[in-house]
Amino acid sequence: YLEDKYTQTSFRPVDHYVRGQMRAFLVFVDVWPTPAVRTPSFQFGGLLEKFIAMSDKKFLSLIKKRPLKTEFYLSFDKNTGFTTEQIFNSFTVILRTIKRMDAMLTKFGGPWLMGQEYTLADIAVLPLIDRMQDLGLDGLWEEPYPSISKWLYKAQRRPATLKSYFQGSRLSEQFPKIVKGPGSLSEWTNKYFQVYRGNPQSRS
């Protein structure tokens, strides 16, 4: 809507092939990493704490009020959260996203996902990668995919991003006793890579 209404600055590639690739990536982001990031957000982001404090009756009442999220809320234990397998499954989806982003940066030459221009592809996936870094799970890409760290650093310093992520908007600022920021959950990312023989490239 915003892209169509405010045409002064376009965030869609001019080249039709590149634009098609961007659209395919937008569908991918909606279907895979967007739902997947909920798991670590609830488990490590302080969001689980409010459920732990609830009675079972109140928790079930909350579920009834949010029918679109019923399946998600019933997928974890309100007192302990998600299983390690569920958490690792979410990591696999995020890592698949990282791998795809890395390939796009290589294919289109960077510095942005679709090439020289910042597009809807960057805008769509930035909140997911920023959230994972804020949770302390940036170990998923820091070593195996340094291109993502460079991309994220650049994207986070755009004026529009700085306005969007105002002071107090990140989970590490809302729940500082729980969420410690970049690198703080390295034991989880290290364990994940150990389980999968330290070869993130094989998890596609």
Please place each PLM-identified region on the residue numbering:
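GST-like domain detector, emphasizing the conserved glutathione-binding G-site
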Residues: 1-67, 107, 113, 182-185, ...
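GST-like fold's C-terminal all-alpha helical module
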Residues: 31-153, 157
